[in-house]
Amino acid sequence: MPNIIFQRTSIRKYTGENVSPEQIETLLKAGMAAPSARNIQPWEFVVVQDRETLDTISEFGSFAHMLKEAPLAIVVCADTDKEMPVQAGKHYWIQDCSAATQNIMLQATELELGSVWIGTFPKEEMYKPLAELLGLPKNIIPVTTISIGHPSEEVTPKNKFDKGKLHFDKW
């Protein structure tokens, strides 16, 4: 079986079929298995299945249009109160939540679901109205939004390996 990392690709069109509760739990477990700075695990996950809410989120940014077809979005949020004093102002939670996002997307591929990463933070026009819509406390920031569903399109993953981007020992 080919490595799931190389099978993953962005899927923006979905059948509309719901993602099962078991699949959602598996996706969330994968997200929580991600590494995090000092093992703080600053993430919180908002599972969005409500059609009206998905449609509203799709209007927050030009790159969120696929949510109009998606049966599910997982909003990966950071609890900024979990930032340790030694980390203050460094926002390691961005990296931590990004790792969780990648894990969820890889797990989606393994489950034969399609997904696409929708950049949320630091775009104020995206993350501020999303935080308000979802009723997030002030210390919780939506970092990424993942659109997830059963793919209605077949997309061949691209080979992105580029030897020109490799540097050993020195630039």
Could you describe each region identified by the protein language model?
Residues 1-171:
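Acidic, surface-exposed loops and disordered segments
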